[in-house]
């Protein structure tokens, strides 16, 4: 079947984030104290979803796009690409790009050399906000509660795919923001978004869920398994060797104003 799609125009690439930082409108006094907010914005980091049924793969007449069976990463063989841009047209997420200089398409490679070595992707490891985790998701009928991704996606269902209505089964999952009107989030993440937000709001009452979230950005290696051990969460690699141990609640150290050892006053500057 012919895949319906569209090619972005030059202006789409020239100003990809135009207006995204703008949030204007009338707000009554005290409205910021209630949620969802009447005026709101949020950042949505988007990468290639490495879909189970990639639209770019189906659209390419040169068969230059393929999905690796061992890890599900979708790659583009540039030696076969002739720059028809059908992959760009076929991807509804627009995460395949045409390089006007090389005259071939290019896309995220899922950092497959790192993944082969048991390490997380570059965007995951360099995220200063520690909002990302990368790993392997099991099928819904083979869920392992010790797998942090299975626990977030299949068990607690707090992480949802973006635009599931496209039918491509994207493999990047998002924890929805809590301050945005549900009607807007529903069209982005599907009908489970209200329950996901309700579960996330009660994360302080769920040590295991809190532990899984604490693993975000805790180690450069892929955590295949995890468990909560007292006040800490422990991550394990594929061989169940410990690779990370992080306190669920960050310890607080209060320093005395006067340092008697150095006979000096401490001053906090922020």
Predicted regions span which residues?
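Non-ligating segments of multi-cofactor redox enzymes
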Residues: 1-270
